[in-house]
Amino acid sequence: MSGELPPNINIKEPRWDQSTFIGRAKHFFTVTDPRNILLTNAQLEAARKVVHDYRQGIVPSGLTENELWRAKYIYDSAFHPDTGEKMILIGRMSAQVPMNMTITGCMMTFYRTTPAVLFWQWVNQSFNAVVNYTNRSGDAPLTVNELGTAYVSATTGAVATALGLNALTKRVSPLVGRFVPFAAVAAANCINIPLMRQRELKVGIPVTDENGNRLGESASAAKQAITQVVVSRILMAAPGMAIPPFIMNTLEKKAFLKRFPWMSAPVQVGIVGFCLVFATPLCCALFPQKSSMSVTSLEAELQARIRETYPELRRVYFNKGL
């Protein structure tokens, strides 16, 4: 074996300490880096080769640790962790900021008429469906029926919320009306994510001890995981949908946007994008990817099995998802 690197760097785990918020934030700033969507197929395949070779104990001569980690994050950004298949471009985590800034900016610009609300809420939920399908579990893949049910339900919920609130806010200030899209997105997340992961709520998700030894499946762990994801998704959208209304409400009274009203959408998209560049990774980092809960919070049957085999165990761990 040749090369400068030791063969025992654990590239299956993130580079930074995931028990701290700072470590998780660094990880997600790298994972959601929009520049990764500009990488060519040749660059993606080169990163895949470096990762696969290293996992097999082959260390290319001259490869540095920074280059190895860069290859690992490029690989993770484009290939499914379970199946190894290349993911749909707009479904990758690196596409979240550019896609969401465009869709969110347009939702918040064109919110006054029913056709515009219908169209942009439909676009947003269609994008969410692509993301959820792209990042589906390889062990328990989504069925077409589950995906369709979640898609239709979330779209209906978002549109109903937006149209209902639009009707209620017609008699209040224009500023209040600008927050309708955020309420619609929050409502859709509360519908979409639990429906998309309904199988986990029924049969549970794998729980392990600290060393990764599988102990069983828990629906209680699934509830905690899904709640954390819903909270982080809503908070992720909040800065990009709560800050721009104040800015745009002021800017649209200025001479520039009165003279060039068509500039409202590009300006709004830019403001939303600036917010999302920071909000996306920071809100992904709110909760550890490897979450934990007390054994006493599990189902009685699973508690009994764990106490029988591991009487000293106090906490179990599980992957919360994204």
From Swiss-Prot:
Modified-residue entries (N-acetylserine), positions: S2
Keyword Membrane: yes
Superkingdom of this protein's organism: Eukaryota
InterPro entries reported for this sequence: Mtc (IPR004686)
A GO cellular component entry from the record: mitochondrial inner membrane
Membrane topology, Mitochondrial intermembrane segments: 121-146, 196-228, 288-322
A biological process term (GO) from this entry: L-alanine transport
UniProt keyword annotations, A-Z: Acetylation, Amino-acid transport, Membrane, Mitochondrion, Mitochondrion inner membrane, One-carbon metabolism, Transmembrane, Transmembrane helix, Transport
Location within or outside the cell: Mitochondrion inner membrane
Entry GO MF terms: L-alanine transmembrane transporter activity; L-serine transmembrane transporter activity; monoatomic ion transmembrane transporter activity
Membrane spanning stretches: 103-120, 147-167, 175-195, 229-249, 267-287
Membrane topology reported for the UniProt record: Multi-pass membrane protein
Side of membrane Mitochondrial matrix, spans: 2-102, 168-174, 250-266
Location, primary (coarse class): mitochondrion
Tagged with keyword Lipid biosynthesis: no
Reaction catalyzed: L-serine(in) = L-serine(out); L-alanine(in) = L-alanine(out); L-cysteine(in) = L-cysteine(out)
Alphabetical list of NCBIfam families matching this protein: mtc
Family of this protein: Belongs to the sideroflexin family.
Known function: Amino acid transporter importing serine, an essential substrate of the mitochondrial branch of the one-carbon pathway, into mitochondria. Mitochondrial serine is then converted to glycine and formate, which exits to the cytosol where it is used to generate the charged folates that serve as one-carbon donors. May also transport other amino acids including alanine and cysteine.
Record protein name field: Sideroflexin-1
Organism: Ovis aries
